[in-house]
Amino acid sequence: DGVAVKQRDEAEYRKMAESKPEWKKYSDALDSLNQYIKNNSDKEYRYAMGVEYFFYGPEFFKMIKASSELFNGWNTGVSAEVFSAEKNKLISSARAFIKKYNEGVDQSIFNALTLQYQGSEISANPNWSLINVAALSGDIYGKSIFTDSTRFIQFVTSYTNKSSKRLTNDPAFVFYNSYYPIFVQEVDKAFRQYQAKITPLMQRYVEGKYTMFPNDKH
């Protein structure tokens, strides 16, 4: 049992740390580490759920990310040559991507993971309670340019500054850009702060293992 082994190892660690005054810092670090992890378990959980959803979830998320340079490039005034090259690269990538894309499978993944992610986030972000996943899924896979090869390639091929208005009505684009920024600006940021606090405590704890148990395999 992993929990029992952890408890046994930590009890042995504390007992050894109490044997010398100069080692007390190691048991203090262990206590602080465990307490901090307990108090901030939500940060690790929300981060893990967000990574699974936004980086390993439905394929249309990847299409939106891949398109961002093209859409942002137009708005930032890149040269016509650069813009055209970016457009052609995106069309080429889309055609390669389409060969292995299965809309039905992707929609099933979206439905399952969105329900799961909604359940994990709803207490932190009440806006999730407003989302009907089945209805949203129908809109995204029935209307979005990012879930249909023909719609996507036609859109990119004829993309101009006026095309950006269509994006504001695209259900996949609107959904992704409503919730992914929250993950980046809130969840990811909080997790990195959590890690920054954990790191020195973990380093002190590991230092204690090497100092107090030099003959053990670490």
Which residues make up each language-model segment?
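Terminal presequence/propeptide segments associated with secretion/organelle targeting
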Residues: 1-218
